[in-house]
Amino acid sequence: EKHIIINADIDSDLIITGHEVSLRRAVTNLIDNAIKFTKSTINITAKRNNLYLIIEVTDNGIGIEPDNLSQIFNRMYQTEQSRNKKSNHGIGLGLYFVDKVVHLHHGTITAKSELGVFTTFSITLPLSEKLIE
């Protein structure tokens, strides 16, 4: 059993157009991964940046090897750390799914990490035209 602190900083009035269930599942996948790998703290932000919504999920967990960062969105790919995790390690489809959903919504996803310190996933999605006007 872990005791995890989750901090959320979410701007109000953020509207995007898209498939709600898929987008919700994509963000949930990132949060589930953060819970799985964090030592104690997860930070979630959703902020407006001009015409885009930027969602970031950061954990202070095991991190991702630099050589793996370019491959983590590939189908069925698992890092060595993930394969060695004793429980709930999945089959390597979660980040692949997130990547596909984000790109289908004309967005981008990136990951940055420092081994043993943190991992941050950033999703950038276009805001709804209703909000931009």
Give the ranges of each region predicted by the language model.
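Short beta-strand/loop element within the Bergerat-fold HATPase_c
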Residues: 41-51
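Short conserved segment of the HATPase_c
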Residues: 64-77
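Acidic ATP/Mg2+-coordinating residue in the GHKL
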Residues: 59
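Glycine-rich nucleotide-binding loop
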Residues: 52, 63, 92, 115-122
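Conserved catalytic submotifs in the C-terminal HATPase_c
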Residues: 5-14, 50
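Short alpha-helical Gxxx[C/S/T] motif in the catalytic ATP-binding
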Residues: 94, 98
